Every structure is written in C-alpha cells, then in structure tokens.
Curated annotation (Swiss-Prot):
This is ATP-dependent zinc metalloprotease FtsH. The active site is at E437. Pfam families: AAA (PF00004), AAA_lid_3 (PF17862), Peptidase_M41 (PF01434). The chain crosses the membrane at residues 6-26, 128-148. Gene3D superfamilies: 1.10.8.60, P-loop containing nucleotide triphosphate hydrolases, Peptidase M41. HAMAP family: FtsH. Residues 1-5, 149-614 are cytoplasmic.
Length: 614
C-alpha cells in the first residue's frame, strides 16, 4: 500500500504549483507560445521588415547612443505554436526609421520596453508552469485514487478482522426456556461437536446446517448461542444483510472469507440471522445488478456448505421466519439438512421464560407468575422479557422498590393496546362505551365457557381503543369446539346488542367486532365444515379463489348470513333477559372506569334473569 506520507507530499506539491498557476492567472499574464529566437544583423532585419515578413515590431533606442537601437519583431508566418522572435541591433538613419514606421514598428524608450519584456518573460514562465501543472495534477489525482482504493477496499469486499473475530458464547441451555422440543433437536449437534468419533464409528453424518424457523422473538439466536456455549465452540454471528452490498461479488467474497475463518478455528458455529436475505429463491424473471449480486452470494454459500464435511467440525445455523421464500437448493440434504421449529411458547413455556427473566428484576412476593403466564397467550420470549422490563419501569416511576402485579398488568395493557390516554368524554360517550364493554363481559359470563374467563373490563382509552374487555384463557387452546366458537360469536356481537338494548341506537364502535365475527362465521362454514353443507372445504385458507362452484358458494354465503343472524338474535334475547345485570355492570364501569372479572361475575350472580325470557 502507498505510504500516506508520500501521498501527502504529492498533494502538497500539487497545491503549491496550482497556487503558482493561480497567481499568474490573477496578475493578468497569458501563456505565450513563443519557443524560438532568431538573431539577425541590422541589414538583414531591415530587409525582412521592408519585405513585409515581420510583425509586431519595436524600435528601442539605446540611451546616450545616437541612432543605435535594438530591433524586435516576429515573423508573420510563425504565428501560434512555435512562433519565432527576431532580434537585431543597428544604427538607424532617418530614412530607415521612416521605413520601419511605414511597417508599423513602434518606437519605445528603454524603460517602457523593459516593462513589456518583463511581461513577456512572465508569459513564458506561465507557459512552462501550465505545461508542468496539468500532467502533475493528473498524476497526483491518479495516485490519490489508488491510495483511497487500496486503503478502503477491504471495507467493500471481505469482512474486517473485527467482524470475523470468533466469540466464546457464555449461554447455556439453562438460559433458554420455552422451547424444550427445539433444544432436544439441536442437542445432537452439541454431542457431535463434543465427541465426533462416536458418530463416525456408526458411519453417521451430522447435519451441516440447521435452519431455525419461527416468528420473531422466540429465541432462535439464543438457541444457537446455547449450542455454541454447550459445545465449547467458537461462535460467529452475522445477519443476512451483512453479505449484501452495492457491488457485485462482494457478498460471495464475504461468504468465502467467513467459511475459511470458521474452518481455521474449528470447532465453530456459524449463525446467520435473517438468512432469507441471501437465501431466497432465485428467479429467472428478475435481472440487474442487485439480482446478480444476490445469485452470486447464494451460489457462494451453496458451494461453501458443500466444501466442508463432518470432519471440519463446522455447523451452520440459519434463522428465518419466512421458510417458504428459501431456495430449494439451500434446503436439500447436505446443506440445511434439518429444520427446527421454534414457535411461540405455550403456558408452561411462558412460565419458564418468566422465571428465567424474573431473576434480573425485583418482583414483589405477591406476584404470581403462573397468572401472568395465563394472561399472556401469544407472547414470545422477547415479549415476556419486555413485559417484565415495562413493569419495572412502571414501578420505578411510582417510586416502588419492587414490582407489583398491578405494574405487570399495566405493562401488558400497554404492550397490547398502547399507552393509556385520558380523553375528555361526555356522559353520553361514557355510557355508550360502558354498555358496549359490559355487553362483552356479561355475555362471556353467561356463555358458561370456563376455558376463557373475563379478567378485566375498562372504559379508559388506550391507543385507538376507547375501551376494552380482557380475557384470560385457563389453558392454551390448540383447537376450538363448535360451542366455543358460538360463544365467541355471541361475545363479539354483545357489544353492539347492548348499545341497541340500553340506548336505542348503535354506533361505529363495533366495526372491529363485526369484522372478527364475520371472519369466524365464514371460517366455520367455508373451512371447518360447521354448516348444513357438511364435511366440505369451500375456500382455500390463503383466501384465493373458492374451491366450490358459484352456486354452492352462494349457498354457503347464505349459511354464513343465517349463522350470524341466528346468533345475533340469541345474544339479544340473553342480554334482554339479563338487563338488570347489564345495567349494573355499566353503572359500575361509569363509576370506577375499570372493574375486575370477579366483579363482573359477582354482579351477574346478584341480578338473576327477568321473567321476560321470550
């Protein structure tokens, strides 16, 4: 590489010469093209002048010398590049002076002509400077470009030494919770890296790659770190986007350098997060530099995974939440042999994750993590960690030394529905929201479904929601029975029905309930066979064109409409019969703004149904 001091020296020379050139330009000098000079005797000069061969002539009389003068001119045929300056010294007669005047020779005294000759000398110097500056500037520019390219080329090709420095993972399987099945599947990799001879004895071959598939935040990165930590292997962690650059060939170069380094430091674990950034399916329809760079990077990855065997003690872990976009060549045996699903944790998994993260925060002894786990279905490991962190922040904001159950409830509501917003609402607005939420809560209690229970009802706005009813499943639900789906439909309809019964009008607040109820009813009829049409799939799960004929599909739509109408009528009858309980729950909400599920069940028990059951 070119030393930087050489580059700086050349740059200084360039700037100095450029400054000199600028000075000549500012003083008004113009480069002269005169490159030769011809010396004649007086007679020859006068003959050339009388013949009209000279131009721009000057007669410079010498001081204290009668008639003696220096004669200067240029030959007319030498204009432009290579012009010749003609000089002579002669003692002129009056007739000769008159003849030169006829040829437009100027008469100067020695002082004025000396100044003119100084300007001419400066012009010649400026010409020389220009002849030097231009090639020197070009050379300096080329050298500078080479210096920058040599110095920074590594940033656009292979990974830097810092990026390829392996780390020793301090994570163990005890730090990873909520994915026991996934841990069991990848534990074979740990055993192989610890004792590869045992597998070679049976002729077995360990997978070269393991693809971790699951939604974001489920612990895929932690699982890969745990494998490296348990196997005492070097850990290389990169993202798929780290291989993507503007210039074609950069990604492939980085893949090769990564695998070369991993082999040198084996046993090694290479973890590529969001691997779909470089592993997505190739397409012949797409073209251009970006597609060419992607294809070259993917090809380099395929070749690299083919280029090592089990003896290299290098295993590649990839993580993605879009396995359907992966190129099939990358998923074939011999590359990513195994796919491990890392899904959202179940109730037991959520409890285990909460117990792991609870060690880093100060929970009050009254906090029941089992209840928190029940109240957080659908939460990932990252969501649960964030829940405890938000609870700690909420407790600190209220100057408490420990985290209470109410802090975690507030944190969960904030994560699910947004921050609490205190809006100024009229009495009428509060009544509408209170009856709407009271209808949801009461209908869930009346359904008799004990798997999902009302946990809390509030009319305090959060995010876009003006109020909400929170439900807690007693256990994880993996499928739904038809009675459970009917109960869900009626609970969704109860908000609108309560408004209509109590206030005599309806509002736009039920738009989300209508969409969810319609979706559930359509799934019951079109996908799950819960209609008189029987055991028949009428639509695809992805929502594409229907599988049935237009006539059959039209009949199915009529069954969807009938299912909604029937349950809307049943919901109206139930809430009309329990109008007293509905009014009492709504009044309690208007007074307290938030009530617990136990309060809803208590009020419903205290207000038996009326005799108007018809």
């Amino acid at each position: 590489m070119l030393p930087i001091r050489w580059f700086l020296a050349l740059l200084a020379v360039f700037l100095a010469v450029a400054g000199l050139d600028l000075w000549f330009s500012q003083t008004g000098a113009r480069p002269s093209s005169a490159t030769g000079e011809e010396r004649l005797d007086g007679a020859a000069f006068l003959a050339a002048a009388n013949a009209g061969e000279l131009r721009e002539g000057h007669i410079v009389y010498r001081a204290n010398s009668t008639g003696l003068a220096d004669l200067h001119a240029q030959r007319k045929g030498a204009a432009g590049a290579g012009a010749t300056h003609v000089r002579a010294t002669a003692r002129l007669t009056d007739a000769e002076v008159t003849a030169l005047r006829t040829q437009h020779f100027a008469e100067d005294d020695p002082v004025s002509y000396a100044a003119a000759r100084a300007v001419s000398a400066r012009e010649r110097t400026a010409s020389i400077v220009h002849a030097i500056v231009h090639p020197l500037g070009l050379i300096t520019l080329i050298v500078g470009i080479l210096f920058v390219v040599q110095r920074y080329a590594g940033r656009f090709t292979a990974f830097s030494a810092q990026r390829l420095r392996p780390v020793t993972s301090g994570v163990s399987f005890s730090s990873v919770a909520g994915c026991d099945e996934a841990k069991d599947e990848v534990y074979e990799v740990v055993e192989f890296l610890r004792d590869p001879a045992r597998f070679r004895q049976t002729g077995g071959r360990m997978p070269k790659g393991v693809l971790l598939v699951g939604p974001p935040g489920t612990g895929k990165t932690m699982l890969a770190k745990a494998v490296a930590g348990e196997a005492r292997a070097n850990f290389y962690s990169l993202s798929g986007s780290d291989f993507v650059e503007l210039y074609v060939g950069v990604g492939a170069s980085r893949v090769r350098s990564l695998f070369k380094k991993a082999r040198e430091t084996a046993p090694s674990i290479i973890f590529i997060d969001e691997i779909d950034a470089i592993g997505r399916q190739r397409s012949a329809a797409e073209s251009g530099g970006a597609q060419q760079e992607h294809d070259q990077t993917l090809n380099a990855l395929l070749v690299a995974m083919d280029g090592f065997d089990s003896d290299d003690a290098v295993v590649v872990f990839g993580a993605t939440n879009r396995p359907d976009t992966m190129d099939r060549a990358l998923l074939r045996p011999g590359r990513f042999d195994r796919q491990v699903s890392v899904g959202l944790p179940d109730l037991r998994g959520r409890l285990a994750i909460l117990q792991v993260h609870a060690g880093s925060v100060k929970l009050d002894p009254s906090v029941d993590l089992q209840e928190i786990a029940k109240a957080t279905p659908g939460f990932s490991g990252a969501d649960l960690a964030n829940l405890l962190n938000e609870g700690a922040i909420h407790a600190a904001r209220h100057r408490r030394a420990t985290i209470l159950h109410s802090d975690l409830d507030e944190a969960r509501d904030k994560i699910n529905w947004g921050r609490e917003t205190r809006r100024v609402m009229t009495v009428q607005d509060k009544a509408v929201i209170a009856y709407h939420e009271a209808g949801h809560a009461l209908m869930q209690v009346l359904s008799g479904e004990d798997v999902v229970r009302v946990q809390k009802v509030t009319i305090i706005p959060r995010g876009r929601s003006l109020g909400s009813t929170h439900f807690t499943p007693e256990r994880d639900l993996f499928n739904y029975s038809q009675p459970q789906l009917i109960a869900k439909l009626r609970c969704l309809m109860a908000g609108r029905v309560a408004e209509e019964i109590a206030l005599g009008s309806i509002t736009s607040g039920a738009s989300g309930d209508i969409q969810e109820a319609t979706k559930t009813a359509r799934q019951m009829v079109l996908e799950w066979g819960m209609s008189p049409l029987g055991f028949m799939a009428l639509s695809r799960p992805d929502g594409d064109e229907p599988l049935a004929s237009p006539q059959t599909f039209h009949e199915a739509e009529r069954h969807v409409r009938a299912l909604l109408d029937e349950n809307y009528a049943a919901t109206t009858r139930a809430l009309t019969t329990h109008r007293a309980a509905l009014d009492a729950i709504a009044d309690e909400l208007i007074r307290c703004e938030t009530i617990l599920g136990n309060d809803v069940r208590r009020i419903a028990a205290q207000h038996p149904p009326s005799a108007l059951a018809g």
